Regions:
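Alpha-helix exit/C-cap motif
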Residues: 36, 41-45, 52-77
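Internal alpha-helical transmembrane segments of multi-pass membrane proteins, especially GPCRs
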Residues: 10, 15-19, 40
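Residue-level signal for short amphipathic helical patches enriched in basic/charged
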Residues: 9, 27-30, 42-45
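Short coil/loop residues immediately preceding or within conserved phosphate-binding loops
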Residues: 9, 21, 133
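Alpha-helical hydrophobic helix detector
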Residues: 17-34
């Protein structure tokens, strides 16, 4: 009996390994962009929900104070403590998701008086504001290049536009030519 005939092949051939590598590469090429889109959509959903929460808080404030002047957003810490404060010293900025700051945010919401463009914060801060209307502008972190810029105001405007439209700012009264409602 021939000893070579009894030996069985052990391991994989080069062609089998190349086929497995190609399959993994194809799956990665499909999965990674889909995951990135999911992350961006999730961040957009979070900021839209936070903007709607702020809208409700603003309307409650106005119902009791008869003006938006003096409004500060509710902030809930991870341990459940509640405070009323903006996330930045300019008294206009709110970072999303909750608990994030200027180094790790997904979206930055700027909340201003629609008439003056200044903060709605209490007058003791030295800012001047009319308090009759407000405007929110959410801008994505630079890591989310495909995300939308989002606008919500007290007049009922709800729109979003692609992030690469640099003409859309907190002072904008609409979302531009290629906008959509949300």
């Amino acid at each position: 009996m021939n000893m070579k005939a009894l030996k069985q092949q052990v391991g994989f051939t080069l062609i089998e390994l190349m086929i497995v590598i190609m399959i993994v590469a194809i799956l990665a090429a499909i999965a990674i962009p889909s995951y990135r889109q999911f992350v961006v959509r999730n961040a957009e959903s979070q900021v839209q929900a936070r903007m709607q929460e702020l809208d409700i808080e603003l309307n409650r404030w106005r119902a009791s104070a008869l003006t938006y002047k003096g409004f500060t957003p509710k902030k809930v810490a991870s341990n459940g403590d509640v405070s009323y404060v903006y996330d930045a010293t300019d008294n206009k900025t709110i970072y999303v998701p909750k608990g994030s700051d200027s180094t790790n945010f997904h979206y930055k919401i700027t909340l201003v008086d629609a008439t003056t463009g200044s903060t709605l914060a209490p007058a003791s801060t030295g800012y001047s504001t009319a308090g009759s209307s407000w405007r929110m502008f959410a801008e994505p972190n630079s890591n989310y290049s495909t995300a939308h810029k989002i606008i919500l105001n007290s007049a009922g405007l709800r729109c979003k536009t692609k992030n690469n439209d640099s003409s859309i700012t907190v002072a904008s009264t609409n979302c531009g030519t290629y906008s959509e409602e949300w």
